[in-house]
Amino acid sequence: PLSTAAQSFYKTVSDYRGVDKSAAAQEMQDEGGGVIAAPVDVRKTAKVEGADYTIRDGSVVIAAITSCTNTSNPYVMIGAGLVARKARALGLNRKPWVKTSLAPGSQVVSEYLEAAGLQEDLDAVGFNLAGYGCTTCIGNAGDLTPELNATITQNDIIAAAVLSGNRNFEARIHPNIRSNFLASPPLVVAYAIAGNMTKDLMTEPVGKDTNGVDVYLGDIWPSSQEVGELMRFAMNSEVFKKNYADVKGNPGALWERVSSTEGQVYNWPESTYIAEPPFFADFEMTPKAAATGITGARALGVFGDSITTDHISPAGSIKEDGPAGKWLKDHGVLK
């Protein structure tokens, strides 16, 4: 539940830094008390958009509404737009250090957000259209500013990302972001405004309005009736028919400009990341008899927690100073 999100982040800090049973800074103590994260709580200044801001553990530096889980759910997309509308009306905005983006999986989403007048509100709080399809959840959000990257890495800050995708592996979203949270599109907007995962959005304000009055999540959260009134824009079947009537025959100008090879078999080029599988080297149409047993087998590797295939074969951006990055640079592959 949302009420335990901040506590979940403190557990992340504890997992990374170990635990400390001594008295810790009050702001770093989780709601349960007892064993708590080591009281590091480093706060450093980073220059973003020409101004200095304090970055600390839990600072949300990426907030993204992504394609993989929102296209088929107009209810939450309209909900996100209404959160943005209400926040905008109160003078709230994303925190300057939060990189925000909106990447629907379909142009239909853009059409009903525009028709409902919600895209303008999303734009106002930083959720501009970035494109369609896989972006942030595969590490393609674009990099953070050099100053922000340096502040995070040089001070071992556990920064956070909040996205409405379906992957939150360490470094999948960004190589320098270790704490990643999955949330609904409306909550992504709310956390972009709050700017930090250590806030309990059930009890603490997300920000202050133009008069300096605290604004809580309930003040900007839309009712079911408010969302329902705008659902008619998303339930227009003609929009879907228009966008998908001739996808194969007319895929669009960008796709038309992509060159491709022709033939029955793929012409494998020399590549640093695509290789012909070696088990096809002596491939025969008639399979050979399988061995009668397996002998001398051993485990290739035994790993601890929080290890995924992303650590073996990066699916997102690759660090230039890591082994894979150095190997690619040695082979003339530029970032």
Predicted regions and their residues:
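Fe-S-dependent hydro-lyases/dehydratases of central metabolism
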Residues: 1-335
